[in-house]
Structure formats: C-alpha cells, structure tokens
From Swiss-Prot:
Protein's gene: rpiA
Upper taxonomic lineage: Bacteria, Pseudomonadati, Pseudomonadota, Gammaproteobacteria, Pasteurellales
Protein name: Ribose-5-phosphate isomerase A
HAMAP family, per the entry: Rib_5P_isom_A
N-terminal signal peptide: none
Role: Catalyzes the reversible conversion of ribose-5-phosphate to ribulose 5-phosphate.
Pathway(s) of this molecule: Carbohydrate degradation; pentose phosphate pathway; D-ribose 5-phosphate from D-ribulose 5-phosphate (non-oxidative stage): step 1/1
Keyword vocabulary terms for this entry: Isomerase
Length: 219
C-alpha cells in the first residue's frame, strides 16, 4: 500500500468524528486534501468549514462546502489537520505547507484536534526527520536566523515562498527538540518570529494513523 492510500485511509476514518450541523475546522496539506475530498460526501449534513489556508478554502468550495472565516465562529466542534512529524505524546511539527500560523489560529478554536497522518510521520523525537518551519517577518529574517544558529539549529530560508500572511519561512535543520513545549515558547518569544511549527502547547487530542493494516485511532 502506498503513502497516498494510507493518507486517504486516515482521512476517511476522520469522518466518523464529524457531527451533523457542525462547522468543521480544516488545516492544510496533502492529507487534509484527502479529508476535504471525503468531506464533500457530507456537504449536506454540515453547516460548513473554517480553513487554515487559501488553498484549503478553494478545495472546500470546489466540494460545495460553505467556507466561514475564523472571525465568524467562537468555537469549532473539531479541527482536522495533518502533521510533518508526530511524537508519542501527540505533539507535532507542522508547517511544511507554510500555513502554520493560520493552522494554530484555527486549532485554538477547538478542544478536539484530530491529527491525520500516514505511518511515516511517527517519530520518537520531533525534529528527527523534518526541519522545523519558523514563520518570520521579512525584515527580521537574518536576525532570527542568527538566534536559531545560537540555539543549535541550521536555518535555511525557504526562498520563493511567501505565507498567506506575507511573511517568510526559515526551515531549521539538525534541530532535535527534546522539550517541545518549552522550545515552542522560547522560539515564539524571539522578536520577529510570528510563530513556529511546534504544536506542543496545543497538541492533538486524537491521532488517526493510516497503516498498511488499516486506520489506527490513538486517543
């Protein structure tokens, strides 16, 4: 079974958590794209969705699902998103698609964060296989990069990429994260950092892993 099939399996399994007449929060990325396609079959059973990226908004509209702004809702029943890495404590690295800030905003609207991944995304230590994305205000790029080097990382400017918020991304390589909640807070306190891709302070509540043996739900 290939990676795409495992992503589709996890996405399909997430539909069981969608409540009738609810507004669903959705993140961004390839696994979320699979979820949005699956959610299209339930378009008449839900009120709509709040999306964490412009790309996800477009896909939702193509499925005939009404899109709401995060400013239109006070809370969301569930938020469904993928991850670039996830550890056994359900903490994640996200931001490979450069939507990390909006993902954190939409995720903060729910108490039920459902992370859908294929089995290749599971790691023991965050930062083991995937660089940590950090969204930075453009004028602070070099200054923030120096701070990341001082913390032991190897930042690389993701050239040609501008976030939906008009900012740039630094990808921090060689940066194993032993204490994700503390590192998330420390990086967010650096002047010029909008946010970083560690999702530890608001970790997932439920993880659905697509495996060759089927979808595995971890609560």
């Amino acid at each position: 079974m290939d990676q795409l099939e495992m992503k589709k399996m996890a996405a399909q399994a997430a539909l069981q958590f969608v409540q009738p007449d609810s507004i669903v929060g959705v993140g961004s990325g390839s696994t979320v794209n699979c979820f949005i396609e699956a959610l299209g079959a339930m378009r008449d059973q839900i009120k709509g969705a709040v999306a964490a990226s412009k790309a996800s908004e477009e896909l939702l509209r193509k499925q005939g699902i009404e899109v709401f702004s995060a400013n239109d809702v006070s809370s969301l029943d569930i938020y469904v998103d993928g991850a670039d890495e996830i550890n056994p404590q359900k903490m994640m690295i996200k931001g490979g698609g450069a939507a990390l800030t909006r993902e954190k905003i939409v995720a903060s609207l729910t108490k039920n964060f459902i992370c859908i991944v294929d089995s290749s995304k599971q790691v023991d230590v965050l930062g083991s296989t995937f660089p940590l994305p950090v969204e930075v205000i453009p004028m602070a790029r070099s200054q923030v990069a120096r701070k990341l080097v001082a913390l032991g990382g190897s930042p690389e400017w993701r050239q040609g990429v501008v976030t939906d918020n008009g900012n740039v991304i630094l990808d921090v390589h060689n940066f194993p994260i032993m204490n994700p909640p503390e590192m998330e807070k420390e990086l967010n306190n650096v002047a010029g950092v909008v946010t970083n891709g560690i999702f530890a302070l608001n970790a997932a509540n439920t993880v659905i892993v697509g495996t060759p043996e089927g979808a595995k739900i971890i609560k």
